[in-house]
Every structure is written in C-alpha cells, then in structure tokens.
Amino acid sequence: MFGLLSRFSNRPTARQVRTAALFVGEPATVDTTRTLDTILRAAVADDASDVHFEPKEDGLVVRFRLDGEMRDHTRLPLIQRDPLLARVKIFGGMDITEKRLPQDGRAKLDEDGKRIHLRLSSLPTVHGESLVLRLLDQTMPVKSFGELGFGPEASEALHAALTGPAGLIFLTGPTGSGKTTTLHAALHALDTSGRVVCTLEDPVEYQFEKIRQTEIREKIGLTFATGLRALLRQNPDIMLVGETRDAETAQLAIRAALTGHLVFSTLHTGDALAAIPRLRDLGVEMFLLAASLRLVAAQRLARKLCPACKAPHPENGRLAEQHGLSGAQFFTAVGCPACRGRGYRGRLAVHEVIPVEKFLPLIAANAPMAEVHALRAQLGYRTLRQHGLAVAAAGLTSLEEVLRVL
C-alpha cells in the first residue's frame, strides 16, 4: 500500500486483495489502489463533503459534492469499475461478496494534517453497487454562530435561550441544511462545566470531549424514542436529540423539558413557526408545548461568493427594485483559480430565529397559524427570505443562490 491509503484504519490484508481480485475477475494489481488514492486525495484537497461512485453500463462515474453541489470528478472505463468498487468496500470493512443488499461501512484516514472519518454506504443498482463516502474532518474546529452566518441579533437570541435552565429549542430545515452543525455550535457555546451533556445522533458525525454521544441503531431497536427514554435515567442536564421523528419522541422531549432539562432537537418543516403545527400533528398538547418551548429557528445553506472574483450583477438596478431593496448592490459568481472556477467558496446559513415568549399565549390557546404569523410580522422577526435577501444585498452570496435554496 502507498500514499494516503496506507494510513487507512481498515487497510486490506493481502488475502483480502486476492479475494477481491478473484471475486471481480480482475488481476490483483496496484492500479486500483493508486486510483482510489488519487480520488481521495483530490476529495480532501477540494474539501468535498461526499464522494459518489456511480456505476454505469460502460464504466464508473466519480462525483464530488462541493459546497452542497454535485460536480463530476472523473470517469473510469468498465474494466476498472468492479475492481475499484470492491477495493472501496474492503477499506470500509464491508462484505465484498454481498452485492444484493445495502451495507454501511467506516474508515479513517490522515491527510495533510487532517484526521478524517469516512462513512460509507452501498446500494445495489442495475449496473452494480452505488457507493457514497461521507468525509468528516475531525480536526475542523466547531464554529461559532457568527462564523456560521448568524447575525448579532440571531446569535444573541440563541445565546439567551441557551442560558436558560430548561426548555425546548427546535431547529428546522430540510436534510443537508446544516442543522446538526448549528446544534453542535450551540453545545459548544454552552458552559458545560458541572453539567452532564448527552446526545442521541443518527449517526454520530463528530466526536466531542466531555459529551456522552450515543448513535441510533434502529436495526436493533435503539430508536430516538427508546434512546431518549433511557437517557432520562442517566441524570443529564442537557440533551441533544438529533431528530424528532415521531409522536413518542416528541412527547418524551416535552416531558424532559418540563422536568428541568435543556433539550435541543430538529424537525423537518419549511420554516421556524411551522414547528408548532408539526408538533401538534405529532400529538403534543399545545398547553404543554407552551410551557416548555423556548425558541424555534430555521435555516438553509447558501454558497458564499468567492471574494476574489465576484462581480456586480449586470441587472442590479432592476433586481434591487424588484425585491424592494432600492440602492442594494447585488453580486454574481464568476469563477477564478482561487475557487477552482466555481465562483463560490464555502457556505453560510440563511436563517430565521424566533424566541417564542410572546407567542406562548397563542400557542397555549391553539390559535390559528394566521394569528401566529401576524404577531411575528408585528414583532419584526425576519423571515428566511428576508434574511436571504439581506445576505445577498451585503454581497456575501448571489441573489440566484438565495432563490435556489429557498
């Protein structure tokens, strides 16, 4: 073995290599290792979050997810397809003889001063197994709310909710919107000295000292609900529940908040206030929600414009007038060597953060959502769209990107 792959935690034995070669019917040459080494080096250098190996009838397509967008990396001939897929599965500790069922795997690597954990998943397709590798840089420091894109007012509201002794904090958004990263920022912002902090995550992506992290394993019955019920017997002060998926988890989270625990969790809703009817649909009594809820927030991830090459938008005047932002200066993506021609570098959170104290009477009375939204407008809390337009007007992202993520 050589290069980056020599530092894998799951390096294949000589016997595994020979077995893989016999199984796929190709010679056990070093070329497959070189190819995988090159692909992973490129993924690490590009800060890719995921690497996709997509089998086709005539070969294998490798794509990277960069700042949330899929980009083609390379295309390999048919002769390399099955040997490379087998090699990836070996490094992930997966069964190369099982191609009919989905599998999960794990590996670790050190590259360029980074300690990266990899989560692998396989899925049978008509042309072979699709493999996806999620790259998780364990050396990356936890970012503050400000570094994630939360403004001063939003950061202050989040910190105020975190200083309370108990209550529920819900973060909403679709898959891939950065909810887990923001929850980790919240845990990092807490003063955990003298307090027990526990998490239930699916899966555990980043590991933290002084925090007890539990990974959900639904195949053996360890769900969020069963985990949360057990967690309540562990004498915790602060709990992070990765997702509130069902009625039992929702009701247990409410119970935990009402009995003196600070609870963070996520929901899949379109905006922050939509968490209220979602929890009602899960069977939560509104008077109990009003007694426990402290803050709701929603977010999306937008790509940041590359500061080295962004340019004023050619239709700036029309766009500013169209969106009611007279005098705003919008920018557009161009592309340069600094951003590898993409026009964007990194991502930031487009968000809405709503402390619910003044909404509690309406929540307890199960008032129509029209009244809740009217109060929101009266109090001046910004919507996702309003914050997105403000971020674009500040030149941090493009208007096209804001409209794409919203």
Please name every model-derived segment:
Residues 1-12, 19-406:
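Short, flexible helix-loop junctions that flank or precede catalytic/ligand sites
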